Amino acid sequence: MRTRTLLTVLVLGLLAPLLTLGAPTQAREAARPGKSGCEARGGIEVCFTSPPTRRNDPTVLARPARLFDTAGPGDTIRIAMFRWDIKPPTDAILAAQRRGATVLLVGDDDLRLNKQGRRLITTLEQQDPARTNVTICRGACLPWRAKGPFPDSQNVQHLKFYVTDIGGVQSFITSSANLEDRQYRQYNSFLKIDDPGLHQFGVDYFTRLQAQSLKVDGLRWSDRQKVWRGGDTTAAVYPNRDDLLLSTLRDLSCTRRARDVSAMFAVIQRADVRDQLARLSRSGCRVRIVTSRDTVENWLEQPLAAGDIPDARVRTVLTHDKMLAVHAKFRGRATHLVVTGTSNTTCGGLLYNDEVMLRIVGNRWLHGQYLAHFDDAYARAWQGRSRVMPVMKPCR
């Protein structure tokens, strides 16, 4: 009996690698651990959610509340938020204000549509009546960069954006997540950069959102002033005729040892972005895409004059993220880079919405964090279940 048992174990041990080789690649990918949690290094902090591996993952939505918990007298928190309907960050920011922190909010009119949003607006004003704490924009706060009409569901203050000065640390923070309940069940990310220069750029943008004007203190911003550069970091704010994501894609090329382009955007509707991704695929890059709608997946899989992205590398999952992780040549030099922020690749996100995007070049650690997040979502995504082909209107 013992001999037969040993033989069985031996045979199974020899067969295991062969059985693994026969398993579908996507099944093996899905067995990997999810990317959930926060990491920090060198003045940069990132947080990610992985709802399929951690039910109702609170990581990204909980991080702002934990930050608010550290604020007190002499600190300032500026928040620009599209949607806000959950209680924990509401409690945390109101408590920070009671402790003496200055809290300023720019919200979309959507905040008035739910209990927590109304409570937030009313209480922020009541607790600090000496100043105007809250600005609510009907539509985008800043002027459009096209004549219109704006696309459906656009012309909004679409930001998930924080500019904080807490304990002497000045930070610029952006996230893909609104402070709303459904975001617990979607892939999201959060990026905090401690940098006084970037922080000041964020303050200057925020004051224009408050004023609902490009002109503040006698200085009018053009599209050129809507971009900040410091070292390997670039920030861009919108509405803007120029696009940080598109310009980045145009400056990419691939070699045998640097050829990975991984993009996760909840929505991709712009033909110029699709063309660049197809061009990179045709030129030898391994382009992988995750989106949130199978109709968008179908549109991305279409063969184009610019190139053709293999259907198997375009997948759908429940994501709200906006991120690009690249290991390729950027302006002729092999590097690692990340682009992330609040904007989907839509005409509204470019021309009609208030948005913010960041690009960080040459930070291999940060690239590795975002790539692991992308790989998590890609492994648990699926091929589209509908063959409906949407019509994406050109930007105007």
Positions of predicted regions on the chain:
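Secretory targeting and sorting signals
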Residues: 1-29
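HKD-type phospholipase D/PLD-like phosphodiesterase module
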Residues: 31-75, 83-254, 290-337, 341-363, ...
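Short, well-ordered loop/turn and helix-capping segments at boundaries between secondary-structure elements
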Residues: 20, 24, 362, 366, ...
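Terminal interaction modules at protein C-ends
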Residues: 258-274, 286-299, 368-371, 375, ...
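Hydrophobic alpha-helix feature that most strongly marks membrane-spanning transmembrane helices
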Residues: 282, 328, 343, 375, ...
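Short, glycine-rich nucleotide/cofactor-binding loops
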Residues: 79-85, 265-269
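Beta-propeller domains
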Residues: 230-285
